[in-house]
Amino acid sequence: MSKIDKASRRQKIKDRSRFSVAGTQEKPRLCVYRSLSQIYAQLIDDSGKKTIMAVSSMSKENKELKGSKTEVCHRVGKQIAEKALANGITNVVFDRNGFRYHGRIKALADGAREAGLIF
């Protein structure tokens, strides 16, 4: 599968799932983006069109993280969950953004669930 096919496949899945995945103020959307070496997670309120909070593997508290990419993703998932719980958010809608639920995406989701987020 060529790189163009992978990108267009992910975009189609992302567009298709956007109809069923929407966040509100009470239950925001946990949107995940995975680049080649980094991971980004955001809590988004789609009704107000605002990002509530964001954590990435490049943020200041994560600069010194050691370990594999999967372990770093697990820690990022725990951090976004801890921030959400501190703001009173317990339920979220998980948006994998067209990526397969496998590897680093799954590690982030598992970390968020372990820290107490419900989805």
Swiss-Prot record:
Keyword Electron transport: no
The UniProt record lists the keyword Phosphoprotein: no
Any GO MF annotation of the entry: 5S rRNA binding
InterPro entries listed in its UniProt record: Ribosomal_uL18_bac-type, Ribosomal_uL18_bac/euk
GO cellular component: cytosolic large ribosomal subunit
Top-level lineage group: Bacteria
Pfam families noted in UniProt: Ribosomal_L18p (PF00861)
Key words of the record: Ribonucleoprotein, Ribosomal protein, RNA-binding, rRNA-binding
Gene Ontology biological process terms, A to Z: translation
Subunit composition and interactions: Part of the 50S ribosomal subunit; part of the 5S rRNA/L5/L18/L25 subcomplex. Contacts the 5S and 23S rRNAs.
NCBIfam families per the UniProt record, alphabetical: L18_bact (TIGR00060)
Protein family: Belongs to the universal ribosomal protein uL18 family.
Biological role stated in the UniProt entry: This is one of the proteins that bind and probably mediate the attachment of the 5S RNA into the large ribosomal subunit, where it forms part of the central protuberance.
Protein name: Large ribosomal subunit protein uL18
Gene: rplR
